[in-house]
Amino acid sequence: MIFSQGSSPLKGDFSKIKFSIASPESILAHSRGEVLKPETINYRTFKPERDGLMCEKIFGPTKDWECYCGKYKRVRYKGIICDRCGVEVTTKSVRRERMGHISLAVPVVHTWFFRSVPSKIGALLDLSTKELERIIYYEVYVVINPGEPGEKQGIKKFDRLTEEQYFQIITEYEDNQDLEDNDPAKFVAKMGGEAIHMLLKGLNLDEIALNLRKVLKESGSEQKRADALKRLKVVEAFRKSYEPQKRTRKKSTGLFPEEDSPELYIYEGNKPEYMVMEVVPVIPPELRPLVPLEGGRFATSDLNDLYRRVIIRNNRLKKLIDIRAPEVILRNEKRMLQEAVDALFDNSRKANAVKTGESNRPLKSLSDALKGKQGRFRQNLLGKRVDYSGRSVIVVGPELKLHQCGLPKSMAIELFQPFVIRRLVERGIAKSVKSAKKLIDKKDPVVWDVLEKVIDGHPVLLNRAPTLHRLGIQAFQPTLIEGKAIQLHPLVCTAFNADFDGDQMAVHVPLSPEAQLEASLLMLSSHNLILPQSGKPVTVPSQDMVLGMYYLTKARFGDVGQGQLFYSMEEVIIAYNEERVGLHAQIFVKYDGKVDQVSDPVRLVDTLVPEEQAERRAWLKSQIEQKKLLVTTVGRVIFNQHMPEEIGFINKLINKKVAKELIAQLSSEVGNVETARFLDNIKEVGFDYAMRGGLSIGLSDAIVPETKVKHIKNAQRDSAKIIKEYNRGTLTDNERYNQIVDVWQKTSNLVADESYEKLKKDRDGFNPLYMMLDSGARGSREQVRQLTGMRGLIARPQKSMSGQPGEIIENPIISNLKEGLTVLEYFISTHGARKGLSDTSLKTADAGYLTRRLHDVAQDVIVTIDDCGTTRGLHVERNIEEETSGQIKFREKIKGRVAARDIVDVINDKVVVKAGEIITDELAAAIQDNIGVEEAEIRSVLTCESKVGICAKCYGTNLSVHKLVEIGEAVGVIAAQSIGEPGTQLTLRTFHQGGAAQGGIAETETKAFYEGQVELEDVKSVEHSIITEDGIEETRQIVIQKNGKLNIIDPDSGKVLKRYVVPHGAHLNVEHGQMVRKEQVLFSSEPNSTQIIAEMPGFAKFIDIEKGVTYKEEVDPQTGFAQHTIINWRSKLRASETREPRVAIVSESGEIRKTYPVPIKSNLYVEDGQKIVPGDIIAKVPRNLDRVGGDITAGLPKVTELFEARIPTDPAIVSEIDGYVSFGSQRRSSKEIRVKNDFGEEKVYYVQVGKHVLATEGDEVKAGDPLTDGAVSPQDILRIQGPNAVQQYLVNEIQKVYQINAGVEINDKHLEVIVRQMLQKVRVEEPGDTDLLPGDLIDRSTFIEANEAVAEKVRVIDRGDAPARIIEGQLYKQRDITKLNRELRRNGKSLITIEPALQATSHPVLLGITSAALQTESVISAASFQETTKVLTDAAVAGKVDHLVGLKENVIVGKLIPAGTGLRKYRSIRLRDNEAEEAEAVEAASDEEI
């Protein structure tokens, strides 16, 4: 990196940084002198040796304002250079910035440019790395100029010669060696860096580029073109970065005595020969310090050792050259010098790295100082240690307000010391800073008073590591406390993910007024009540507080004073204080305000008022109906004392869910201030009543239901029945296993439900265990099941970490934790429990790494403009299936977005939301309830067209403030935090289940969700008689078509209420047009296998189904029944042979009517020659059911796979066109599937044998439909259905993992931001007339700009009588040529013939987040992410400029980030005092009058 001498890099006023290869001139220009000796300091005086690696003359004095010999001391001699020792009198800090250099005896190749992949030097010289290595390390000669001897011997430039060959030519043509070196007839061959230097210097890059482009256009060989393209990229990079005429004269700096010598200009741009170094820069000594240890020894930086080796070898080589040593010795010394310089620049690349003497570890070279977590970028530039900070253990501060924290006095006095000292001096309490410090050290009482004043209104920042999202750092108003621990408000724990079991937190003091202002306005905890990731409240009461509120608002029948009538709320509280009425008593209160309640109050009158008081009953009912009376409990009256007026009276049992909804409602209706006040009040109430209720649990509170024994007996009976069937041979082993697991899963859930009900009824619902559970304070139904029901089935953990479904051990644990486990049961359950704990620690690292990659890819996405003006948007539909399965509701998808088109109610054609309007929470809720709105088109980040960053309209509202996002908001970072933070949460959640298997009762019956009329779409079914378990024959409708749909429609409006996909082989229970009621069974299907069903009558005929070859007959030892399973037959046959097992249905005459391929592992259900009726099962293909739910271990790798856009391990083959399927010929290892459309277009796919083919002969498929099973690759979706489809697919798939596996809510817009970044690049196909290269990966905006640049240009085909400057084949502006043609026509000359310039073509590329982060336009950002040396090498060669637009680059160079209040437009704001100006104007006017 070159800074021109005139502008010191330390001044902050630069706006971009250019990277280039340092030329020898620039290295010398930065250097203050040559380092000649390897010595560092004198062993006796410990002062730096002159001309050594620490020399004061070169690098500056080691003491402030003092020269080496001591002649000049004090600041008054500033700038004088001592005449005795030559040291300039200045501050010692210059030793951090002044550089030196070493002049090498022979040129040395820079290892970065030679060892990078592809090798930059290799690409320019067209030599392989192996050959280059032999030249550089002095093994072979390379011909630089063949001259006459070369021509005679047939030797060309760049040929490699061995020593014998070289000496043979030299001796043969002795007189040739007397010629001048630059004589073209002289034969020149060299080795080492010198040879490479001469070769690079002699290159003509323009000529090479022309030839390579020719190869690209004309060559037929793919390999040649690929090689040419690789070389062309490097050649073009050099050509673009170097224009030799650009010489900038350097401004005088006043630093050099020889300032005005003419050599002091710097070449801007790179010459190829700069990759070979003649001068090595020496970095400032303070950056490679010598630190004295006790005992007179020194610890040194590895760099000093590496420099020492270079200097020693260089000096030795100079001596050897002077004494004319033999060539062999010189060559050895030169090679050693090359190796020493290699080690200095990059020691880790070498196989034989230089090691230290004692510990035998490789020395840390300059490259290692930049790389990795401990390197310069990540250790010192992105994460610095901070002054004015402290850390301590946290304890709970229940009496704090939401915006406060308790700060120990001893910490506060340290942190605020400068402020306190200033106050003490200002007030005259202390005379000087020194005496003020003494006062503070003495802990004088006056100090505490001053500290109180200083702290008032000065916020501090609290941070808890790991800071996973922006709520991990919040501002608080400190209050001074005794003790040594920081007190934290209990409601902010969720945001920090803190608990009080020994967590520590750091305190930081914002110093400047701007920082204090930002802290108190933007970061104050009472302003951060909403999670940016989902828009839901984060300051939600938990544990004790919830329990207290629940206890307070719970009603108990028959409590003291039940059914009394009160005149006002105050009266109720007086009565309660007088103990006339119980806390849980249900009472009547006069109230006519707004009420939010669930139950029907009129019905309660009958239970609360005795029958004999009929008149009173009637009067109460009439009052309630007129909304003048309220039926509530005493506790709810107390709770509602703290409710803001606007919300009204909350007449509900308050549990965590209700509390959360309430806080969300408050925050949007009454604002943060009121909400914070309310939160503090309910915190007090919650803790208070949790204490008063005295709620604690004992063993007797866990009640085991008596029916448990009965259920277990039933289950044992059912599983015995299944085993009996298996023994009879009607079930396969796989089916037996699946059914047994199902039985126990159902039983386990049944027992759990009953134990839950039992707890609910115990003590009128006041069982402490049940209250803790029901209020949401602690525990889950899952835990109750294990405590009082049965532990149930346990997963068998897998060896692999890839998160495959763990198999379930089919013997359940029948005991629960209250009864205690048997030894065997305990042993079985240990395994899962331990795995949970070890998984946790392993996965946290993965989640952290995912977060880092997300941040890196999205860090420069900032809202830059208000509206990009795009007309495109995302299409969102209401999907009832997803909503019922607990996925995101339609409302959540459209909330906070801007409508791209009008949203219309189809039933009455009314516009609900106009295009360009924000869909607020109210509008979204109205749309959710209005079934007339089926779909909406919303603006999205995915379709945003702004060139840099994104626009506010496409992003929508900022979730944490419910307003349109502001310009300057760093939405990329927020997106990365929102996705990464739950990732780390998820991984930590596995072990709470204790390894108990969950989920996975596969639903066999599908029931109607609404009542309505059945409509069958593409459902073909046949009647088929089956024998049920009880031995009765029944006729069923069996579906024989794939992908049929069953819709339930509203008979009045004809609207589709719900769609179901009817699986192949399902038993259909309803008919077309039939009316169904809610919960009626529509169809049932077998979940554990895919069935192959006969569609027509005939006889079964086996084709290629041979015993021992394509199928094996397994006789079950227990049952004696034979089961036929298709096996992988490839190993059984010779290479040329092939088989394709299939079952055909033939007519009586033997004509084949339909064939069904049977995949490997399927079980046959028919015999050869058996009579078939439609609906018969031919074979079943077992499915692997993913039975272990809940554990995101499967989820995190899945998320990573999607974000990295990896191709799945066994991807589905996808049809590229719409058409009909037919099967082609069968080869040994694959069969061919053809898809042909009506236009005669045909695509052929080869499927590996044994892969299950989903399509059958004659099926109609759409482009993008999978033809075989397996996951669909996102790359295929992009290729076939385009970028929009793949974006939607990625967002939906990632959303599914978070939603289903973990129940975490993340707003779509965050995922969209990341997915947008993954599709920012395009690959150039044909460059046309632009200066792009084919195969280049560039930003979409760069591509559009390149095309716009040639849009107004034309190419000259025939120059006619044009002036000489017009060259055929070149591009010119259209208007210039038109002007010339006008003149030519006027003069009667022949005109210039032109054609429009060709634009480039490209296709979008989907990059994973790692590669997207490395491909970023900013060099600094990419270098600080991964592969630092590679990024810097490429940047230097191409002369890249970093414009510092992202956040990361600016942090690294120490500037304000260009987001939020750091936006460039805010830097030049001038404030005006309007009142003062008006006053002045009035004064001026009155003066004039006078």
Swiss-Prot record:
InterPro entries registered for this protein in UniProt: DNA-dir_RpoC_beta_prime, DNA-dir_RpoC_beta_prime_bact, RNA_pol_asu, RNA_pol_N, RNA_pol_Rpb1_1, RNA_pol_Rpb1_3, RNA_pol_Rpb1_3_sf, RNA_pol_Rpb1_4
Say which domain of life the source belongs to: Bacteria
Give me the Gene Ontology terms describing cellular component.
Answer: DNA-directed RNA polymerase complex
Give the function comment from the record: DNA-dependent RNA polymerase catalyzes the transcription of DNA into RNA using the four ribonucleoside triphosphates as substrates.
What's the cofactor? Mg(2+); Zn(2+)
> What's the gene?
rpoC
Protein name (Swiss-Prot/TrEMBL): DNA-directed RNA polymerase subunit beta'
Tell me its family: Belongs to the RNA polymerase beta' chain family.
What is the organism of origin for this protein? Chlorobaculum tepidum (strain ATCC 49652 / DSM 12025 / NBRC 103806 / TLS) (Chlorobium tepidum)
> How would you summarize the oligomeric state and partners of this protein?
The RNAP catalytic core consists of 2 alpha, 1 beta, 1 beta' and 1 omega subunit. When a sigma factor is associated with the core the holoenzyme is formed, which can initiate transcription.
Against HAMAP family, the record matches this protein to:
RNApol_bact_RpoC
Picking any one GO biological process from the record gives: DNA-templated transcription
Annotated Mg(2+) binding lies at 499, 501, 503
UniProt binding sites for Zn(2+) 2: 868, 944, 951, 954
Q: How is the cofactor bound?
A: Binds 1 Mg(2+) ion per subunit.
